[in-house]
């Protein structure tokens, strides 16, 4: 009976980014992280983060520090869609501007190395309705309501 209870305990897959644990990623320097990223991200980090990116990281750190334990931090709004997600951003809540509104994005470990803009769609996907007059040649035979 005890063996059955032991089997019921679920084991979750530990996150790794290119074979490196999240805890080790947090301890790495930017130079070591750059070796793990793809060429585009390496080039971007090699050229350096600008003042706006540094201020976003500072605001994210502050929001995480002020959050009560076991609670999500306050949402930090930003227009920086081209910011690469770094390991220190994991667990933060970011409002990414899509041109009209700020979409809330919770940064997860799987997002490391991607851009913030990839998680905030800038257009409304098309919902196709019924064809109207002039839509196609065959739509002439569709009865009007």
From Swiss-Prot:
Task: Specify the signal sequence span.
Answer: none
What is any one GO biological process for this UniProt entry? rRNA processing
Query: Where does the record say this protein resides?
Result: Cytoplasm
Q: Which UniProt keywords apply?
A: Acetylation, Cytoplasm, Isopeptide bond, Ribonucleoprotein, Ribosomal protein, Ubl conjugation
GO cellular component entries: cytoplasm; cytosol; cytosolic ribosome; cytosolic small ribosomal subunit; focal adhesion; membrane; nucleoplasm; nucleus
Carrying N-acetylalanine, the residues are 2
List GO molecular-function terms, semicolon-separated.
Answer: DNA binding; MDM2/MDM4 family protein binding; RNA binding; structural constituent of ribosome; ubiquitin ligase inhibitor activity
Task: Tell me where on the tree of life, at the top rank, the source sits.
Answer: Eukaryota
Cited PROSITE patterns: RIBOSOMAL_S19
Find the cross-link Glycyl lysine isopeptide (Lys-Gly) (interchain with G-Cter in SUMO2).
108
What is its quaternary makeup? Component of the small ribosomal subunit.
Family designation: Belongs to the universal ribosomal protein uS19 family.
State its role: Component of the small ribosomal subunit. The ribosome is a large ribonucleoprotein complex responsible for the synthesis of proteins in the cell.
Enumerate the HAMAP family for this protein.
Ribosomal_uS19 (MF_00531)
Q: What is this protein called?
A: Small ribosomal subunit protein uS19
Q: Which organism is it from?
A: Homo sapiens
